[in-house]
């Protein structure tokens, strides 16, 4: 519903990072919803390092959606580094996350802080459940998500955010409480994944057709298809290579044994995670 004082918002940019496809599914759904309301959406996928290194002009867009997975309680480091190079010039924006049903609060707080530093104006955020990346290695978190209820929430998010863009309504936005973890503590938490994923994506070379896709798609240029493994310094354990291998010959060590521990650490159960709902913050 438009008000007389509303500003035109007809061209929207959608910047997203998606290694295993969950965030892209939400981005696609937002695009579909907005285009149904005659808003043109241009998608810009920053998953590959080549795209992240291009200079992007934001001038021609009325507003921007950013979509990121949550990695170790925040937007992935490579996305934050990309954002640090952008100039917001008071452009209106919104951020949505996908996450695997564990920690997520600091992601909203820290993305707001970073976007404000870069002079973007945040009008809303949202979080959507997405099958946990580490399910490829034996976990069972948020399997089958995003699902129909997440997509319905996505539609609401798209509509409500568009209304806020048009009204330039930034009054109540995302008043996230100061989080209990400092950036330095979160940097340390980021390293924790390598305590679990001890063997980086590695090829079981029996059936490999050497298509090189793992190397081409790697977001950080870490994968070496000929060697059949990833560089330990550069790999961010995003599993893009594993998720997209047409021969299904890439794997890490099996972390199924760490699943119960993970649930206990978070004082939760598989059922509780499966029942979690996606949320919008206006
Ligand atoms: C390195 C890494 C760290 C992650 N950290 C978290 C986390 O802190 N909390 C959480 O709930 N999910 C976490 N996840 C799961 C992802 O946020 C989730 O699976 C997301 O939907 C993946 O998005 P994509 O399919 O677009 O890549 C992590 C995944 C990876 C690869």
Where are these regions (language model features)?
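DNA-binding recognition helix and immediately preceding turn/loop
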Residues: 196-206
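Short, solvent-exposed loop/turn positions at domain surfaces
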Residues: 52, 229-232
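Iron-sulfur cluster-binding cysteine motifs and their immediate structural context
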Residues: 203, 209-230, 240-258
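FMN-binding flavodoxin-like domain, especially the glycine-rich phosphate-binding loop
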Residues: 2-13, 20-48, 54-198, 256-261, ...
């Amino acid at each position: 519903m438009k008000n007389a004082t509303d500003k035109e918002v007809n061209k929207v940019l959608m910047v997203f990072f998606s290694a295993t496809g969950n965030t892209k599914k939400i981005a696609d759904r937002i695009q579909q919803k907005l285009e149904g309301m005659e808003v043109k959406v241009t998608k810009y996928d920053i998953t590959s390092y080549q795209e992240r290194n291009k200079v992007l002009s934001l001038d021609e867009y009325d507003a921007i959606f950013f979509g990121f997975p949550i990695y170790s309680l925040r937007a992935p480091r490579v996305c934050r580094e990309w954002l640090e190079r952008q100039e917001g010039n008071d452009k209106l924006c919104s951020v949505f996350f996908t996450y695997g049903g564990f920690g997520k609060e600091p992601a909203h707080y820290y993305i707001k802080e970073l976007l404000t530093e870069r002079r973007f104006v945040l009008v809303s955020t949202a979080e959507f459940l997405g099958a946990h990346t580490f399910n490829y290695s034996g976990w069972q978190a948020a399997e089958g998500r995003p699902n129909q209820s997440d997509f319905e929430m996505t539609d609401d998010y798209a509509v409500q955010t568009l209304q806020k863009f048009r009204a330039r309504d930034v009054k109540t936005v995302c008043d996230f409480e100061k989080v209990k973890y400092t950036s330095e503590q979160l940097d340390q938490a980021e390293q924790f994944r390598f305590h679990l994923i001890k063997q980086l994506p590695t090829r079981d070379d029996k059936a490999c057709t050497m298509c090189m896709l793992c190397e081409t798609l790697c977001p950080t240029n870490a994968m070496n298809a000929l060697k059949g493994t990833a560089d330990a310094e550069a790999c961010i354990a995003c599993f893009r290579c594993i998720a997209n291998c047409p021969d299904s010959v890439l794997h890490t060590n099996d972390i199924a044994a760490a699943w119960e521990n993970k649930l206990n650490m978070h004082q939760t159960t598989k059922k509780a995670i499966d029942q979690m709902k996606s949320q919008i913050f206006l």
